[in-house]
Swiss-Prot record:
Its main location: membrane. One of its GO terms (molecular function) is proton-transporting ATP synthase activity, rotational mechanism. PROSITE patterns: ATPASE_GAMMA (PS00153). The gene is atpG. It is found in: Cell inner membrane. InterPro entries: ATP_synth_F1_ATPase_gsu (IPR035968), ATP_synth_F1_gsu (IPR000131), ATP_synth_F1_gsu_CS (IPR023632). Keywords: ATP synthesis, Cell inner membrane, Cell membrane, CF(1), Hydrogen ion transport, Ion transport, Membrane, Transport. It is a peripheral membrane protein. This is ATP synthase gamma chain. One of its GO terms (cellular component) is proton-transporting ATP synthase complex. The keyword Calcium does not apply. GO terms for biological process: proton motive force-driven plasma membrane ATP synthesis. F-type ATPases have 2 components, CF(1) - the catalytic core - and CF(0) - the membrane proton channel. CF(1) has five subunits: alpha(3), beta(3), gamma(1), delta(1), epsilon(1). CF(0) has three main subunits: a, b and c.
């Protein structure tokens, strides 16, 4: 059995850990609100941008001059998985859930005889994926030095992806990130971004509105598609940021509660042990006095 001194050290250590987790919870809570507002503000813009491009793309579908980002290469052999995760841990299953979804997709494609390449954004995803797919990772970008996420960060990633596509390095690109729903719910999401997936109009939708475009649809799409790619990546980064702080806040809250439970149990054991030792000493003193 541990000595009273060891028990006191253990209780003090647990209390110190509880202070750290409580502080991290409060920091995450303070940053969550701003990150959540940024993610929610980006959604309408990204969705509207996607809708506008889908409308133009529907008119340009089948055109021999359609941009390759829309039409694709005509093949489905090489897949690039753009996996966006966080730079830090202590956030529950936030990073591992995104990695798990990407890993499952990669293994499924490889079982179908497809070639898979990985483009990692974020240190944690890279560290986990390289254990299994070290040879498939073609690029890794870390954002640890970025204090405030900006559109320029997404543009940089989009430029690298488009450059690889134009070089013929892949046929299909899928974006993986975590969509923020609430503090306790973040949804791992996979979204194909190259070639662009044009959603068909709903069966119960009314007649489609006819638009006239100037310049031609193909020319408009050639300028809009690369920007839309950056917009979708920027949205994913913002969603990830909010999801990270939500997951961290929840994880640190659970850790703080667990530390409190552990402190109570350790204190109870300490008090019982101390009481038993005092009782034993009293019995020894009384027995010695009676013997005299």
């Amino acid at each position: 059995m541990a000595s009273l001194k060891d028990m006191r050290v253990r209780i003090a250590s647990t209390k110190a850990t509880q202070k750290i987790t409580k502080a991290m919870q409060m920091v995450a809570a303070s940053k969550l609100r701003r990150a959540q507002l940024a993610a929610e503000a980006a959604r309408p813009y990204a969705e509207r941008m996607d809708a506008v491009i889908s409308n133009i793309a529907s008119a340009a579908a089948g055109s021999p001059g359609a941009p390759v980002l829309l039409a694709g290469t005509g093949k489905d052999q090489v897949h690039l998985l753009l996996v966006c995760t966080g730079e830090r841990g202590l956030s529950g299953a936030f990073n591992s859930s995104i990695v798990r979804l990407a890993r499952e997709r990669a293994l499924s494609l490889m079982n179908q005889g497809k070639e898979v390449k990985l483009f990692c954004v974020g240190r944690k995803g890279y560290e986990q994926l390289r254990r299994t797919f070290d040879r498939q990772i073609v690029e890794n970008i870390e954002l640890r030095s970025v204090r405030q996420l900006g559109f320029v960060n997404a543009e940089d990633i989009a430029h690298k992806v488009v450059a690889r596509f134009n070089n013929g390095e892949f046929d299909v690109c899928t974006l993986f990130y975590s969509r923020f729903k609430s503090v306790i719910s973040q949804i791992p999401t996979a979204q194909q971004i190259i070639p662009l997936v044009v959603e068909a109009p709903a069966a119960n939708a009314g007649p489609a509105t006819s638009y006239e475009y100037e310049p031609e649809e193909d020319e408009i799409l050639a300028g809009l598609l690369p920007r839309n790619l950056a917009v979708q990546i920027f949205r994913a980064l913002l969603e990830n940021n909010a999801s990270f702080y939500g997951a961290q806040m929840s994880a640190m809250d659970n850790a703080t509660r667990n530390a409190g439970d552990m402190i109570r149990k350790q204190t109870l054991i300490y008090n019982r042990t101390r009481q038993a030792m005092i009782t034993k000493e009293l019995i020894e003193i009384i027995s010695g006095a009676e013997a005299i």
